[in-house]
Amino acid sequence: MMRVKCSICDKIETIDDDTLIAKRLRNRPIHTYMCQECHDRIAKKTEERLKTGKFTFHPGQQKKEKVKK
């Protein structure tokens, strides 16, 4: 079992060592853990902002194809 700390609310939880999130946290220290309560709260507020029409959601940049010469 791996102990992790939520980067928003500082709640400490344990996750299984074999999960994908545990592997990401071990191999890439830049990744941060967020508990399910914080994740749900942020998702709910984001959906509310989207419904107002004043907020635009940019899901991410698409990778450009590299052309070899």
Curated annotation (Swiss-Prot):
Pfam families: DUF2197. InterPro entries: DUF2197 (IPR019241). This is Uncharacterized protein YlaI. It comes from Bacillus subtilis (strain 168). The lineage of its organism: Bacteria, Bacillati, Bacillota, Bacilli, Bacillales.
